[in-house]
Amino acid sequence: MQESASRLLVIGGSPPGSGCVAEIILRDICLIYPLSRIFCFATVDPSYKFEPVQELSSVQVCIQRTKHEHGYRAVGCPIGSLTAFAASSFSFRWHVKKLVKEAVLFGRKHHIDKVWMILDTTTTIAMGMDVALELGVPLLSNVWDPPESFLQQRRIDRFSRSRLIKRFGETLRLSEKVAVVSESMQQDYEQNYGANTIIMRHGILPVQQSEKTKLSCIDKNIVIGFAGGLYAYSAWSCLMEALTLNDWKLNGRNVIVRVMGAGFYFQSKEKANIEYLGWRSMSEAVKLLADCDVNYLPYPFESSSYYMVKYAFPTKLSTYAATGRPVFVHAPEYSSLHRFYKKHPVGIYCSSLEPSEVITGLEKLVSNKEFYAEMSNKMVEMANGELSLENFHKQFAEFVGIKRNTLLTK
């Protein structure tokens, strides 16, 4: 079995772990791949603390600290941009070349067959195709978020951004296969870069719950669930305003918003019913969300998040799918979610920041038992289909060019 699996060198901004989403996805992939044939080269922030996963103790992991991953300006004016560009051109490029050499040595040591570049940081984009070219092996590229989004978030100056995005395109063109997360990303990367793409989205096992398609008892509160990082501030503020204006009631029943995540900041001078449960493991989060009536999936309406909203795909939808509960999607019409939702309607889609429209959508979902059951059933179908663990495994096998039965799954 192991002989048919390529010896993979994975280069990305995180090692496999149980912390952030990137760590979890890589961990789940390592757990199904022959452990003696996957090798991880992680370029992490200087303050990052590596916590190995016990089940993956035999996986060879090389941790390298990044420099100049985030931009800076010496002066807040055009001269400042030029100064930052000069610093990047010398210090950053020198450091990237050093990392490429280290990755090549690591790859040669382990007789690598293919390089899998996860283009999720400034550093990995700058490394691009160089490691694969030096090793003389095929290149696989993986894009979770569009570079236009996270390079701007990292305050990379416009000159370096332009150079890095050009580098990104060159890497995709030279890749044997490119894994993307959304239909919008797939369409544009094929058109703009001639990339050979495949959609690859994380999947998890659904919870076993016999009452998924039913609302909670009529004499109980309506619980709206939310898990993960909160960065869709305008959408969240709109939800809070809508519930406040409606006295935190839907269809005459009290509403509780259940929140899970490592950090959560909220303040209100009005009545609010928020249950903050802190950070929970994936399995805990799924069970707690499955006990909610509907789960909330917001995406930013802010123009500064345009690229992320259009091209990225929220991994929390895979988590929500595993619960079997319908979702209230709150996102602009140009988002990747809108295109996905038209094909997979699993609740209510609201593209407005008008509080009245939020209430109308939520009440439609929780007041119509037949509609609620239909949406719940569609969510169960999606959890066992498009966003299933099995489909994730199939997509990954196709991405790396191996047979599905090569993966170590039951």
Spell out what each predicted region is.
Residues S184, H202-G203:
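Carbohydrate-associated surface elements
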Residues S234, S283-A290, N295-S318, V327-R339:
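Nucleotide-sugar-dependent
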Residues M1-R65, T197, L243-K249:
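N-terminal subdomain of nucleotide-sugar transferases
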Residues L205-Q209, S216-K269, E275-S283:
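Conserved catalytic-core segment of nucleotide-activated headgroup transferases in glycan assembly
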Residues V44, E170-T197:
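A short, active-site helix/loop in glycosyltransferases that binds the activated sugar's phosphate group
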Residues D28, W94-K97, K101-V104, A126, ...:
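Membrane-proximal helix-turn-helix segments that form the acceptor-binding/catalytic region
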